[in-house]
Amino acid sequence: AKPYIPTGELSRGSLSPKTPEETWRIIWQGCWPEVAEDTPKNRNIFFQSLLQTYIERDVILTGIRNLSDFRKFLTVLASRIGQEFQLNAVAAEVGVATQTAKQWLSIAESSGIIYLLPPFFENVGKTVIKRPKLFFTDTGFAAWLCKIPSPEALSKVYNNGSFFENFVVMELLKSWIHNGEEPYFYYYRDTRFNEIDLLIFDGTHYHPIEIKTSDSPQAGMIKAFDCIKGNTVKRGSGALICLTPKARYLSSDVVAHSIWDI
């Protein structure tokens, strides 16, 4: 498969389609080969040992004394996936100094636990948000840290859309990294509450992507795409990635399609 870029074409990937139930199971299980087809009990044991590995290998090496606080820190991060990362708020919730939280964030990022999606603010003015958005590299690990007991429960939690968005962003990111390509991924949000979940830069154009758990995509879901028009930015074709069983056009250059159609 090639690095994912919205092409404006209906027919795309060669992955077999999956139901929403199957999709939530994959998001809940995560993408580690050890748990992908395994039982909830074995999944629990695996993530427990994974956490232990992170702590022993990375945390102790960097001199973190309070391991339970670091676990709490990761759990707080997991509860905030898909949100703008606000260091002070996270530090306050964990009960540690802001500088400590900053150091721990750096460890979590360098260990490959989290991914920070940078904001886009090139030539758009001073009204855009300039904090990164927080994602976990594995949604299964995040769901485990949040103690979400099953795929069905995950599909019903208040922030299920954030878990779905996290999963989609990671799958798209992997399509670039596995092809040896440098991904130029951003998100857009301004103080007028306009938001574009993901912008992919292909070297000349920025391709806007909206991510929704809906199975019936509507044109109104992509109205924020117009935010980057009229600036010096060249906008490319876009996509709405969702749970729709069938791809369809939402405009002349925006296609709604499944995550399994990338």
Language model: regions and residue ranges:
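Domain-level recognition of nuclease-like catalytic cores that cleave nucleotide substrates
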Residues: Y4, T244-I262
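Arginine/glycine-rich "motif VI" loop of SF2 helicases in the C-terminal RecA-like domain
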Residues: I177-H178, C227-R235
